[in-house]
Curated annotation (Swiss-Prot):
The keyword Transferase applies. The gene is trmFO. It holds the Pfam family GIDA. It catalyses: uridine(54) in tRNA + (6R)-5,10-methylene-5,6,7,8-tetrahydrofolate + NADH + H(+) = 5-methyluridine(54) in tRNA + (6S)-5,6,7,8-tetrahydrofolate + NAD(+); uridine(54) in tRNA + (6R)-5,10-methylene-5,6,7,8-tetrahydrofolate + NADPH + H(+) = 5-methyluridine(54) in tRNA + (6S)-5,6,7,8-tetrahydrofolate + NADP(+). This is Methylenetetrahydrofolate--tRNA-(uracil-5-)-methyltransferase TrmFO. Its main location: cytoplasm. GO terms for cellular component: cytosol.
């Protein structure tokens, strides 16, 4: 297939990946037609028509360079990521993590793209894969049925899927502050989480209620298949009595404050279990229940989650929901630039490629956008070094074992190992990997 001679590039979908791709293309002087169906047709999970809307958590996760996603964010900042820049401008307190005011952040991304002179925003549903120009498809895990059928045809079948869930959000003014305390785990960064401590007796009663609560019916006949990073809390609870104690209800590093007077197990300094609440908006009026993605019926959510100390009278401004997320057989279908092996004028980006997480989705859009622009200009494809986070992630999703392919968060395990003797101290090893990654990225960019 010959390269398109169109004078613009299509980007379909204005989520995190599509927004990033559109910006990266436009900043390279190429006109963009950015299609977004929200405003014409709603999705089950989106609440607004803003671009790059966050439908699950409001956290971009760890911000330290000793954390792989922290490294990825720093690499993206050096590549002038619109998602990172607007995220920074709308940060809310989150200890050692990066969390954002979800509405302010999405509104600022939307305004920047809508006001860009080279970006033509078209509010319309696309049901066919365009063949008039180079195209980036970033319609996400909530792709409309009509377009999904065409993408599945490109895939040669129905592809894969998993179920994703979002956590409830509560009104802070309805929390009983006498039963909770402000603290970040291990006192890392500023104290940014409200902690709801549980005694063993409270936890056991909560676990029983959670595992016997009624779930909402699925809209699909297909077998449930969850991504481990966004598993419903009730599914986690059913895996074992202590599973949650090693996950979102882990108490380590969250000792009682000296002035705590609530119930506790004997003289223990640490609760048996802790439920954490994280600020969800800049005003600090909304908090989400960390790690409590759920698919329980709404009435059951209210009944069970009001068993959490401090939330007995909590008002839920949004209940948790679950939805199907689709992703492609990327190892067989895509190159490391997220370009289709079957159609070189076609790129894919976002969670549909098998990257998992807000930051990872935006990163895939950044890579796809840069390379769509380079293809337009008839320049050589840009493959980032495997020593970097932004290079290792696309390499992983396009080289994994197709038979066992699952969505992947960025992590140090997929980044090329350091040369020389192994550094035994994990923190020092991660610091060395990050230092090498940023140096290699700078070298890569300087050579362009």
């Amino acid at each position: 297939m010959s390269q398109s001679t169109a004078t613009y590039i299509n980007v379909i979908g204005a989520g995190l990946a599509g927004s990033e791709a559109a910006y990266q293309i436009a900043k390279r002087g190429i006109p963009v037609k950015l299609y977004e169906m929200r405003g014409v047709k709603a999705t089950p999970q989106h609440k607004t028509t803003n671009f790059a809307e966050l439908v699950c958590s409001n956290s971009f996760r760890g911000d330290s360079l000793t954390n792989a996603v922290g490294l990825l964010k720093e690499e993206m900042r050096r590549l002038d990521s619109i998602i990172m820049r607007n995220g920074e401008a709308n940060r809310v307190p989150a200890g050692g993590a990066m969390a954002v005011d979800r509405e302010g952040y999405a509104e600022s991304v939307t305004a920047e793209l809508e006001n860009h002179p080279l970006i033509d925003v078209i509010r319309d549903e696309i049901t066919e894969i365009p063949d008039d120009a180079i195209t980036v498809i970033a319609t996400g895990p909530l792709t409309s049925d009509a377009l999904a059928e065409k993408i599945h045809a490109v895939n040669g079948g129905d592809g894969f899927y998993f179920y994703d869930a979002a956590a409830p959000i509560i009104d802070k003014s309805t929390i009983d502050m006498s039963k909770v305390y402000l603290k970040s785990r291990y006192d890392k960064g500023e104290a940014a989480y409200l902690n709801c401590p549980m005694t063993k007796e409270e936890f056991m009663a909560f676990h029983e209620a959670l595992t016997t609560a009624e779930e909402a019916p699925l809209n699909s006949f297909e077998k449930e298949k969850y991504f481990e990073g966004c598993m419903p809390i009730e599914v986690m609870a059913k895996r074992g009595i202590k599973t949650m104690l090693y996950g979102p209800m882990k108490p380590v590093g969250l000792e009682y404050p000296d002035d705590y007077t609530g119930p506790r197990d004997g003289e223990f300094k640490t609760p048996y279990a802790v439920v954490q609440l994280r600020q969800d908006n800049a005003a600090g009026s909304l908090y989400n229940i960390v790690g409590f993605q759920t698919h329980l019926k709404w009435g059951e959510q209210k009944r069970v989650f009001q068993m959490i100390p401090g939330l007995e009278n909590a008002e839920f401004v949004r209940y948790g929901v679950m939805h199907r997320n689709s992703y492609m057989d990327s190892p067989n279908l895509l190159t490391e630039t997220f370009q289709s092996r079957n159609n070189p004028n076609l790129f894919f980006a976002g969670q549909m490629t098998g990257v998992e997480g807000y930051v990872e989705s935006a990163a895939s859009g950044l890579v796809a956008g840069i390379n769509a622009a380079r293809l337009f200009k008839r320049e050589e494809a840009l493959v980032f070094p495997q020593t970097t986070a932004i290079g290792s992630l696309p390499h992983y999703v396009t080289h994994a074992d197709s038979k066992h392919f699952q969505p992947m968060n960025v992590n140090f395990g997929i980044i090329k190992e350091l040369e020389g003797p192994r550094i035994r101290d994990k923190k020092e090893r991660y610091e060395a990997i990050a230092s090498r990654a940023l140096a290699d990225l700078d070298t890569c960019l300087a050579s362009l």
